């Protein structure tokens, strides 16, 4: 699949819907497709080509929020493809993997797996974009510099060197320079994915898959135990700054602007939700109880707000796009955070 077809496929992505009897007297709702977000940036000056992936693990907030901040920037130099929410279902659920660990599905995945289309789209993005490097962003447990079993605050490599990729050399550059600006210091973790026996599972992960397909890749980890989301985002942006130096990437205004304005650039606003209930529109911007007659058909027509906004039914399979129900609460979320809710009751 070429890049044009990849982008087309991403917009046509569909998700499963359960089957119900036609004479069901309950309410019926149809939700929008979950977006597979991708943003391509190109500077006027030639530089490197970098692919940024966030959100493979849905409860790693600092990672996907930092990736998301890059979307609003323009490039002065180089090229970049940003996929900030690669596992949006898990982000909305605020769990590592709603359908299992997506970062163990790159070696092989069943077509029946709800993550299948997203994993395949990520693979196609990598192969069609042909980046100089892929950076997979995560928030890991603990502090690797203090605990050999921890992953937080680290640059993760699969080998010291893989083919002609000097992974340790580049990781060392990032570690040494980023540590000048971080209170909690970074370690380098070498999983020895292809030569060792401890982390064989990494062959199934994104970076291992990339290397096997001759694409250089690193994983960068902030710590889940940092005191705030601000600190996690800060850690990621400081690490990215060093990668950008190596790969000749320059942002208009500089990445330091993002680092200095993390809170200002992450202010949430309540989105406007437009429903269609039996053909009649209902616009909502705050919590409300809606009473509707039996057999009513409800459709979420639009969600107008920020990236990461979505309508999330409470206690319902998040892979479903449409279903029947009697009484249900719908959380209006930005990523993991509920901004308000809509209660719909059958009368």
Task: Map each language-model feature to its residues.
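Hydrophobic h-region of N-terminal signal peptides that target proteins for export
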Residues: 13-20
